[in-house]
Every structure is written in structure tokens, then in C-alpha cells.
């Protein structure tokens, strides 16, 4: 009975990946090699994928492909490409200990580690999110350059301000930054 339940769950999950926008992206007869994708500017628009878990899964697949490709090419002191991850909390979500399931926390940890390591292979990563507290703390810690625009919520200001080694006064000032102004660390 357990085996049939697992089979049914897997079939349902795989079937859901084969329909709609996900199906057009994942269930194809011909794919584009990662080498070709990285040879030009490319945008992966995932708006049609409504489920955050599926978005994280697709982004994770792309990230693993990118990581393995750069790793196989060897280390580089030259910037070979930049990956921009908007609304990064979908991939690098802050899951407080005790919440969520272990596989999600493990996956998030692996993604954070991959992002930290991939820089040594010449890959730049730009992590963008409007709510710092939604991001895994390792993501914030592992970024080399931090840029923050006006941030109103106190918990978000404290989170990013601490990562930027700001004084309490500087953290408070983040709520009054004008449009186009930012703090950089």
C-alpha cells in the first residue's frame, strides 16, 4: 500500500511538471545546451509558474546546470557571466529551524553553498529581494557586496544593517533614504 501511494504521488508530481508553462519548459523534445545559453544574454521568465515550490525546483535545476558547467571549465579569476536571481526568497527562503520539512531545508542549504562556491569559477551572482528577512541568513552572509535602498520595516533594516556592519543610527536612516539613493557595503 505504501509503495502504491508513493508511486501515485510521484506520478502526480511528474504529471504536474508536464502541463502548462512548466510543460512547455520541461517536457520538450529538444533542449538548448547550457554552453549556448551562457554564450549570450538570456532571461528565464518564470511568471507562468504559479507554485513557489515548482519555481524553486526549476531555478534549482538551472543553478545546478550552471554550477556543473562552470566547475567543469575550471576556476577563473575573470568574470565569465552574471546570474541575476530576482525575488530570491523563492529559491533561498529563510526557513527558521523547526519549520518546514528537512528536505526543503537541506535543499536550501545546498543552494546557498553552491552560490558561495560558484564565484570561484568566474560566475557572478546578483541576489535581489525586497524583504531581507525572507532570505536565508547564509545567503546574506555569503554575498560580497551589499546594496540596500529605502527599507521601512524595522526587522528588515536590522537584518541587512547587521550584515552591513551598520551602527543603530545608520540602520534607522535606511527608512528615510530617498528614491535612487542606497547604502553600499
Regions found by a protein language model. Give the residues of each.
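P-loop NTPase motor domains
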Residues: 1-116, 120-123, 182-184
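Conserved ATP-driven motor cores of ASCE-family P-loop NTPases powering translocation/secretion/packaging/pilus
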Residues: 106-185
Amino acid at each position: 500500500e505504501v509503495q502504491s501511494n508513493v508511486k501515485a504521488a510521484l506520478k502526480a508530481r511528474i504529471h504536474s511538471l508536464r502541463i502548462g508553462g512548466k510543460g512547455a519548459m520541461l517536457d520538450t523534445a529538444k533542449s538548448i545546451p547550457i554552453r549556448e545559453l551562457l554564450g549570450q544574454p538570456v532571461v528565464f521568465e518564470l511568471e507562468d509558474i504559479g507554485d513557489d515550490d515548482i519555481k524553486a525546483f526549476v531555478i534549482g535545476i538551472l543553478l545546478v546546470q550552471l554550477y556543473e558547467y562552470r566547475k567543469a571549465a575550471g576556476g577563473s579569476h575573470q568574470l565569465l557571466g552574471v546570474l541575476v536571481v530576482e525575488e530570491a526568497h523563492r529559491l533561498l527562503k529563510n526557513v527558521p529551524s523547526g519549520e518546514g520539512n528537512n528536505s526543503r531545508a537541506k535543499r536550501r542549504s545546498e543552494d546557498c553553498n553552491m552560490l558561495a562556491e560558484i564565484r570561484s569559477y568566474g560566475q557572478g551572482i546578483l541576489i535581489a529581494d525586497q524583504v531581507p528577512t525572507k532570505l536565508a541568513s547564509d545567503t546574506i552572509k555569503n554575498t560580497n557586496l551589499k546594496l540596500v535602498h529605502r527599507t521601512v520595516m524595522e526587522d528588515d533594516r536590522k537584518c541587512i544593517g547587521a550584515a552591513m556592519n551598520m551602527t543603530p543610527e545608520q540602520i534607522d536612516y535606511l527608512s528615510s533614504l530617498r528614491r535612487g539613493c542606497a547604502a553600499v557595503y
